[in-house]
Amino acid sequence: MIEVKNLTKTYGNFVAVKDVSFTAENGSILGFLGPNGAGKTTTMRIITGYMPATAGTVLIDGLDIFSQSLEARRKIGYLPESPPLYPEMRVEAYLRFVAKLRGVPRAKIEPALEHVLEVCGLADMAHRICGQLSKGYRQRVGLAQALIHDPPVLVLDEPTIGLDPRQIHEIRGLIHHLAGNRTVVLSTHILPEVSQICDKVVIIADGRVVLEEYLKKLPAGTSLEDIFLSAITKERHEEGASAEETLEEVGAGHT
């Protein structure tokens, strides 16, 4: 389970993420949906321990990602937007390397390697050089490295971006298969991705959560696209109105 509470990240006067809270339950796939620049990647980096927050807490199966970082990060498999591959390494050598970094016991490395190669459809690619793989297969290797230590939590940042339609279909199917008893957070700006494979959606706009709901509880006859557009339009309207009020107050103070 992932519990995010009142997460805020600022850079000087710029607020990238403000008071973000949501929960991803065990065995579920949560779609973290928002337009480009909404704060999705910043949030993903914070909840995986790769970036500090300005304020707020993140619990990974009850462990604080900030104060119990090593223990919490062992429970996470993370696929960033660009898979962290070494292009000169062969697939199996790279995955063995990651397994050692992740603390997989020596006696369990080969079984773990065999498992992720099979699950991710890479059995025939084990001896291939990472840099010579298609983008779809590089993404599969990225998923394999996130799974090599058998984590209970998977965080995937834009896992299908830049793929062709066939590759997108294959990766979505793979993600759905991998979920099982894991908690999966899938960051994306692609509406069909959420509607096809997710159980729950969190919509973020301008660094704020504007909706958190299970897909099956969305109003009947209303599409996710309608809800998404309505939510981000409302947020931006309220943000604009708030800015206007602030300017009026400042102006009144100078009269």
What are these regions (language model features)?
Residues R96, K100, A107-M125:
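Conserved ABC ATPase "signature" region
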Residues I129-L133:
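Conserved ABC ATPase signature
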Residues I148-P152:
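A short, proline-enriched helix->beta-strand linker immediately N-terminal to the Walker B motif
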Residues L154-E158, L163:
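Catalytic Walker B motif of ABC-type/P-loop ATPase nucleotide-binding domains
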Residues I168-G180:
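Helical segment within the ABC ATPase nucleotide-binding domain
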Residues E212-E213:
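ABC ATPase "signature
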